[in-house]
Structures are given as structure tokens and as C-alpha cells.
Amino acid sequence: RDCCTPPRKCKDRRCKPMKCCA
């Protein structure tokens, strides 16, 4: 649901493209 918190969720392929993961 929220990819930015915690930041480690950025490893998820659905979250990775999000600006907060850049």
C-alpha cells in the first residue's frame, strides 16, 4: 500500500519505480 515507508519496501518491483524510491 505505502511503498515509501519503510524505505526497504523499495526493493519490491511494484514500488521500485516510485519517486520515493529513486
From Swiss-Prot:
One term of GO molecular function: sodium channel inhibitor activity
Keywords assigned by UniProt, alphabetized: Amidation, Disulfide bond, Hydroxylation, Ion channel impairing toxin, Neurotoxin, Secreted, Toxin, Voltage-gated sodium channel impairing toxin
Primary site of residence: secreted
Distribution of this protein across tissues and organs: Expressed by the venom duct.
Modified residues (4-hydroxyproline): 6-7, 17
Record's GO cellular component terms: extracellular region
Annotated S-S bridges: 3-15, 4-20, 10-21
Pfam families, A to Z: Mu-conotoxin (PF05374)
Alanine amide modification, residue list: 22
Location in or out of the cell: Secreted
Family classification: Belongs to the conotoxin M superfamily.
Domain notes: The cysteine framework is III (CC-C-C-CC).
Function (record text): Mu-conotoxins block voltage-gated sodium channels (Nav).
Protein name: Mu-conotoxin GIIIB
Source organism of the structure: Conus geographus
